Design a protein with these regions (language model features):
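Dual-mode signal for accessory low-complexity, basic/Gly-rich regions
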Residues: 95-96, 111-174
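Histidine- and/or cysteine-centered catalytic micro-motif in compact active-site loops
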Residues: 46, 88-90, 105, 114-117, ...
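Short loop/turn microsegments at loop-to-beta-strand junctions
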Residues: 97-99, 195
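A short, structural micro-pattern
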Residues: 37, 79, 140, 164-168, ...
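Hydrophobic/aromatic beta-strand elements that line small-molecule binding cavities or substrate pockets
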Residues: 102
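Intrinsically disordered terminal and processing segments
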Residues: 169-216
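Active-site bordering "gate/hinge" segments
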Residues: 1-97, 105, 200, 204-209, ...
Length: 216
C-alpha cells in the first residue's frame, strides 16, 4: 500500500479534487443514489456538514489523516434515508463475490440479504445489539455515513481504508455516527463500498456509472 495504490497518489491533486467538489455541495440537501443493480436510496443532508479535509495533506503539528487519504463524506440526516441499497464492491475488509442488499426505512437497516455474508452481518450486528439497552438496540443499524472516494490511485482490494477512497466509488457506513455529531452511540461502524453508482444532489448529477460528471 505504501509504494503503490492509494499511497502513491499525488495528495496535492487529491486535495485540489476534493476542494473543487465542495462548491457542488452548497445549498443541496437531497441525495439520491441509484445503480443498475437495484440501488434506489434517497436521504437528506445538511450541506454545511460535508467533511472535505481527508486529503492526505498533514503538514502542521497535531494534524491527523487517514492512510491512504482521499474522501469527501457526511452524516445522513437521521431518520431521512429510505430505499434499497446494493453493496457490490467490498464490505469491511472483504471483497464481495455476492452482492449485499440492505432495505432501509427512516435511516435504519431493517433487512439484510445476500447469502453467507448477509448472515454474518446480521449475526455481528445482533451480537453488538445484545449489549445495549433494549430501546437502543435498533440503533446499531443506523446508516451513519455516506461518502465519495476521491483518490485516483486507490484500488479495490478488500482493505476498506483504501477501497472507500477509490475515485468514483461511494460508500455507506452502518452503526455508530457520534464522530459526525449523531446520536447512535453503539460501538460498531462498518462501511460498504459501491461501484458503478449514479448519484445526484438535488437535481445536480455527481456520479454517472461510477465516474464523476463534474470537472474536478
Amino acid at each position: 500500500m505504501f509504494t503503490h495504490g492509494g499511497m502513491a497518489a499525488d495528495f496535492n491533486n487529491v486535495k485540489k479534487r476534493i476542494s473543487n467538489l465542495g462548491p457542488h455541495f452548497r445549498r443541496r440537501r437531497i441525495v439520491n443514489v441509484k445503480s443498475k443493480l437495484g440501488t434506489e436510496i434517497t436521504f437528506e443532508v445538511n450541506w454545511r456538514e460535508w467533511k472535505l479535509d481527508d486529503n492526505g495533506i498533514c503538514n502542521r503539528p497535531r494534524m491527523l489523516t487517514n492512510l491512504p487519504a482521499g474522501k469527501a463524506f457526511i452524516m445522513p440526516r437521521e431518520g431521512t434515508m429510505n430505499g434499497t441499497l446494493i453493496i457490490n464492491g467490498s464490505w469491511d475488509s472483504s471483497l464481495l463475490d455476492q452482492n449485499i442488499e440492505l432495505q432501509i426505512e427512516n435511516g435504519i437497516v431493517i433487512d439484510v440479504k445476500g447469502g453467507t455474508i448477509a448472515a454474518n452481518i446480521r449475526q455481528e450486528f445482533g451480537e453488538v445489539a445484545k449489549k445495549l439497552r433494549s430501546k437502543d438496540r435498533e440503533n446499531v443499524w443506523t446508516v451513519a455515513e455516506f461518502g465519495f472516494g476521491m483518490n485516483d490511485q486507490a484500488r479495490m482490494g478488500g482493505n476498506v481504508l483504501e477501497d472507500e477512497k477509490r475515485l468514483g466509488t461511494c460508500y455507506f457506513s452502518i452503526g455508530d455516527n457520534t464522530a459526525l455529531g449523531g446520536s447512535s452511540a453503539v460501538g460498531i461502524h462498518i462501511p460498504g463500498v459501491l461501484t458503478g453508482a449514479n448519484v445526484w444532489l438535488d437535481d445536480s448529477q455527481i456520479l454517472q456509472d461510477g465516474e464523476f460528471v463534474l470537472d474536478i
